[in-house]
């Protein structure tokens, strides 16, 4: 497993060791001990989520307030997404900065997104299935959304040959 710090050092890109042969492939998609060692702290996941989205679906930018702020380990098991992480920690030297990565079933990359970050993604393929582990349970009372096109962040979303589809909550930033 190769772990790389991105432009925002607390966000980590994880690239698994993939073993391929004529039968297909095998890789370890999650190892608690290796992840903890790579990011330098003990993380405990409490919930797994799985979503499916059609091309052009944009989800986010989502986060949860304390005491239910979530760390997330995200990956795509089918299709491809443009994944975005925004630092919303007011006391951070990287506050307001964002990083992006193409996550796909093909490249098998994952992102570790610590607490204090907003997260979203745009589906680039005909559809994509997205899996993520969270460090806190979902809490409707603490759930927040920042509009994907918020002027303070100036995120460069890719242009695609499909209409962008947003939920009402994501459109309004609720």
Residue ranges of model-derived segments:
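Conserved metal-binding segment of the jelly-roll/cupin
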Residues: 103-127
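Non-catalytic, conserved peripheral segments adjacent to functional cores
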Residues: 1-106, 127, 134-174
């Amino acid at each position: 497993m190769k772990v790389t710090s991105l432009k925002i050092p607390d966000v980590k890109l994880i690239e698994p060791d993939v073993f391929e042969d004529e039968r297909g492939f095998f890789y370890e998609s999650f190892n608690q001990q290796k992840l903890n060692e790579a990011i330098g702290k003990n993380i405990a996941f409490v919930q797994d989520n799985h979503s499916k989205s059609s091309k052009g679906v944009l989800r986010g930018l989502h986060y949860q307030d304390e005491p239910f702020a979530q760390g997330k380990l995200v990956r795509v098991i089918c299709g491809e997404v443009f994944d975005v992480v925004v630092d919303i920690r007011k006391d951070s030297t990287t506050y307001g900065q964002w990083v992006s990565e193409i996550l796909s079933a093909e490249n098998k990359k994952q992102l570790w997104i610590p607490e204090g970050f907003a997260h979203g993604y745009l589906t680039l393929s005909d559809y994509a299935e997205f899996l993520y582990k969270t460090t806190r349970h979902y809490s409707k009372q603490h759930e927040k959304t920042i509009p994907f096109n918020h002027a303070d962040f100036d995120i460069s979303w890719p242009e695609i040959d499909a209409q962008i589809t947003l939920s009402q909550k994501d459109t309004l930033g609720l």
